[in-house]
Amino acid sequence: MAWVESRSSHFTARHDDRDGQDAVEVLELLEESREELSALLEPPQDEVAAVIHSSFAGLALSQPIVPVVSAIASPASRRYLAGWPSQSEIHLLAPRVLASRASSVPGSLEMLLLAPAALYAQLACGRLNPVLPPPLRPRSALAAARNAWIAAGCGQWLSGQTPHARPAIARRLKEGPRPSFPPSASDALLLGGSVFDLLAGEQGPQAAVKLATGPPADDPRKTLARAFPGRSLTDTEGVWRAHLARLAGS
C-alpha cells in the first residue's frame, strides 16, 4: 500500500489514498480534541502523527499489542478496540472501517468515531504519567495491565465517549462475571471511563485529570482510596456500581 500524508496545524496523518477524506476528518477531530484538552492539561507540544490503517490486520501487524488486548477484552468491549497510542503516534483504524465495526445499538457508531480523540487523550496523559503507556515496555507490562483502567478510562472520558458507551455497558452487565472494582484489564476499555465520569461528577474535572496524570499506587485499590477520600473503598465501590447501573439504564 502506498502511504499518503495529510497535515494540519499540530498533526500529520499517514493513510491510504482512498482514505483521504477520512484523514481530513480525523485531523479536524484531533485539532478539536487538542484544544479541549488544553483547558485541562498540557497537550503535547510536538507534532503527533495519526497512522490510519485500512484493516484490523494492518493495525495488528503495526502494533502487535493490539491482538493481545483484543484477546483479553470482554466481548462487549472488543469491537471498540480501534487503535493504540505510541509516544509520538496514534495508530488507528480508518473511520470507514470503524463504522463497519459498529453495532446497531445507539451510541456504538458515535463511540467508535471518537476513537482518534480517545487515543490522543491516552497519548497526552501517558506523556504526563510515567507509569502509563505509551511507551509499553516489557519491564512495565504488568504495571500497564494493572492500570489499564486508568489509561483506557481517561481516554474514554476526555474524548466524550462515556455517554455513548451506555448500551455496551448494559450488555456487559448482563454478560460474564460481575465486573471488578477497579475494572480489570478485560473491562478497562469499556468500563474505565465510568470511574472518571463518577469522579468528575463528584469532585470536578481536575480531580479526574489528577487521577489520569498522577503516578498510581502499586495497589489499584490504594489509588482509588486516594482518588475518592472521605469514605471507605467499599462504599465507593457501591456508589460506582450504582453509577454503572444508571449508565446502563439511561
Predicted regions and their residues:
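Acidic/histidine-rich, surface-exposed loop or edge segments in extracytoplasmic proteins
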Residues: 4-22, 95-101
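Soluble non-cytosolic domains of exported or imported proteins
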Residues: 17-32, 106-115, 145, 149, ...
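Zn2+-dependent metallopeptidase catalytic core
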Residues: 18-78, 106, 113, 117-120, ...
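Sec/Tat-exported extracytoplasmic proteins
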Residues: 33-41, 119-132, 158-162, 199-203, ...
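Surface-exposed patches in mature extracellular/periplasmic domains of secreted proteins
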Residues: 38-53, 131-137, 169-170, 207-214
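Zinc-dependent metallopeptidase catalytic helix centered on the HExxH motif
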Residues: 71-170
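A short, charged helix-loop
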Residues: 169-181
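Pan-zinc metallopeptidase signature
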Residues: 178-250
